[in-house]
Amino acid sequence: MTVHNNSKIGLIGQNVLFDEVKLIDDGLMDKFILDIQNHIANPTKKSAELIANVRCWSSWLANGIKIEPIFNGKKKACSFIPWPLSGLLLLSSRITGQQPEFEYAADYVLRSGILPDQELDNYDDLSKNIDYIRSIKPLVAFHDFDGNEQGFRMTHLAMERTSNMLIENALLAAEGVDIKENLEKIELATMQSNQLFNAMWKVSEPLLYNKEVRIFIQGLFGNQGSIYPEQGLFFENCGDIFNENYDSKGCYLSNLHGQTGANSSYHPIADEITGVGNHTHAYICLLYTSPSPRD
């Protein structure tokens, strides 16, 4: 579905992704509803993975058709999600508790790359870090499989891989087990994450970030009234609002936030478990107290 598919032009580059999505069999929605009913009656790991996969890949397709016009000379994105993709995305999002918008963890990075079997022994060598990031293969992409998008996304995936050490030792430290040793391992994990982060602009051109990377993950919030209509996205057959442009009924969703690596909980966890958060106050939630009613 990419703009560039290695040496070929992908579906977005050919401006045919929307047309291909409209060919999806309506029967998939009926089948998915049955799958969900079976999962509710008898939940299994396999049935849960099926629902998560539908959520992930329907989100990829929806995001692809949204941005397709931009890469084909248009100033406006596509704001129409056709049936049954619209139903698959909304229902799977509801079941998994996700927003029906592209998400950093579930879609863009963590579920869409194939990690090599072996990690590096350490991350002190920048050139090895670059090779390691380039060895991570994306399952799907919007712009390219081996260029700026691959570099940006797979840098984040490599960083998240080091979180195994962070989470394991944070839990042990919180339980009071070998606190000094576990805090040192947390420090090591965050250092490795930062070492990989330092390779990002070696594998992804910063001047092309907005054009080839950011545009796919920026969401509706702040973009309605510009590249998207004021009403937001229209999901066909998911409501009773009539859309004259597409001669169909559905519903609008608006102000959905896009996501980037800043949505990862990795470094907030590290800051809180080490006490850094006490000094930065970055993650303190200020509670709102309503004024007292007048006598």
Task: Locate each region found by the language model.
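Hydrophobic faces of stable alpha-helices that mediate helix-helix packing
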Residues: 156-170, 190
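Short, charged/polar, low-complexity loop and linker segments
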Residues: 134-153, 168-176
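Conserved small/polar residues in nucleotide/adenosyl-binding loops
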Residues: 288-295
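Non-transmembrane, amphipathic alpha-helical segments
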Residues: 46, 147-158, 178-181, 185, ...
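Intrinsically disordered, low-complexity acidic/proline-rich regions
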Residues: 1-39
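Acidic, mature catalytic/reactive cores of soluble proteins
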Residues: 73-77, 181-188
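Extended amphipathic alpha-helical segments with heptad-repeat/coiled-coil character used for oligomerization
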Residues: 186-284
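Long, charged all-alpha helical bundle/coiled-coil segments in cytosolic proteins
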Residues: 41-133
